[in-house]
């Protein structure tokens, strides 16, 4: 079973795997542990990762990058429209209203949904993992920003399915970093001690996230998390780009922003300059050759200028830090350490802002690039039954409060209940009880839209079906289980109706007692029900019910029973209670239909097959080209002696014609055409190659056979001379060996004489394979006879027995060590020196 963690970044991706007792970040086919989040589509194939990044400038309109923020959003979303201005490729509205990318692929304009684009990238990462692990990969854990909403999370899950991956968990990036930090710590406080509080700061290319986590031995709890989804390394790049665009407009009279290719080149150079300024405070040059209109441009920048330029961005670093401390109810002195990850945290001014706020040094013990992927791989290992991992519990949180809304029966009023508050532990389940006589609908939405970086608060609608009144006409008691699952996604997990069946003989008593709660008010029966008597818009607060569950431990929190609950329990005992599961119809916001998802999966399979066929075609073409260059080079050197001048001229012309064909009409041919062309060349080239190989290897093969013949001849000569080493060999068998060796020598001499009479351009009389076969036959025939071991000479048994009889003690010697046991009944000395007498 594979254990893979994937850091699905905005700019780059990392893959970590669990193997050899640890976590290892793996490299791709370019020996690079970092795979760019880029997909370039061409007329015949796709390039993904490093190959696609090299085409960002050359294939501007069809190279997709920077698409992570488009997940789960409609085309009309303000964020999508903002990103649209930044992106050099075209965005398109899909039939379901979501955002798609319009590119040219296989010589036609085609739209791709964001789930398909991310699916392509994940499929590439899957392939890289399989190449490293040498086995299929299916299960994985994928990282996402902690601020992703339900729609965005479901979109990433769909992309994983498109790639053929089974995502065991969508893990918040800061939580993954916390796991990578905490699981190896041996000095964490025990469970009964005060936890160690650590702040994790992650500023990547597009977003800034902060979380506070409490650590005990074998336990991690996320206390609070804050973020700025619109602050990252690319904002600092944009500040530099805007500065140089203005400068070049004044200095060179060119408008860079009108030329997308030039703008991309400037972005690349500004990113390099930003990284150089992080390590160097002096003036640094910016030089770009043939930038626009054949102009070479140049400028310079230093760190002080850069920090002044980005002052407004640096001012946004502190507010999330203050917010996370307020939410966690912690002071600066409560923080044990501050860990930073993400590429943008390498900017000295960002580090300075963090240090100034916490008044303590920051720690850089974690790998800023790979910590998220390593944390995901650890989580995958914890979830996998194939790996034994140190026990470590992880409690994440809900970043936004979630509220349920439903219609009441009184004048079409509505009821509301906040089921999960902000920073509520997750994964978590709650059971809510409703009193209803008919099917009803629950609407889930984010309570405070101003806290959510998403324009629509809706999560989804859930219809509880098959709800009917009780047999006595009363409302049915419907228990609804709501859940924030391991992926951080809200759902209505199940619903059931409690059906009361009165026992015979107790009908009147039961009826009276079931009415008692009604007179006391239905709120007393259940903490989360709607007061039907008050119409209009009302709110109630969700309280912990006895059914409330914490998923990661499986324990249930039991509430102490009240007096009223005791009376209800007595009523239940007098009646038969039956729980019936109810069907739930879910309508989730921005959820892909199963048919659409299946079509995406099918299309991805077709594109993978197209890539495979194109690779095979290119490999066949490259094989022809390689053969032409290699053979032509050897034809003028090592093969020259093995071909006649006429044949050489003919073959040289054929090679030259093939080379010209490759760059003309043979530029774009089916795979089989290249295979046939290579076979045609080999038909003429292989005989020459064979003569050369035979000529090179024949002397060694002949020498080996000659040595073996000489060794056997020496044994035959020694046997004739009555050498005692071979006097055990059978004379008849030795005669057979002598005859075999004589025949072998005659065969060898005749073949060598015949070969010496031939020129190098002629086919050999004897092949190396025949000589090797002859050598093996000689070994098989002669060796069992001439190397038969001498029989061992055994000493006579009588002498051995005689010797053993005289090895005992002589008269007068002590024979205590070998004396036999005394007979029963006779007296003997004991260890204590006493004598036993009968």
UniProtKB/Swiss-Prot annotation:
Cell compartment(s), UniProt: Cytoplasm; Nucleus
Function: Possesses chaperone activity in vitro where it inhibits aggregation of citrate synthase.
Tissue spec. comment: Highly expressed in testis. Also expressed in renal medulla of water-restricted animals.
Record region (Disordered): 506-566, 784-838
Protein family: Belongs to the heat shock protein 70 family.
Protein name, per record: Heat shock 70 kDa protein 4L
Assembly, per entry: Homodimer.
Any GO MF annotation of the entry: ATP binding
Induction: By hyperosmolar salt stress and heat shock.
Composition bias type Basic and acidic residues, residue spans: 506-554, 791-804
Listed GO biological process terms: protein folding; response to unfolded protein
Cellular compartments per GO CC: cytoplasm; cytosol; nucleus
Pfam families from the UniProt entry: HSP70
Organism (species): Mus musculus (Mouse)
Comp. bias regions, Polar residues: 813-830
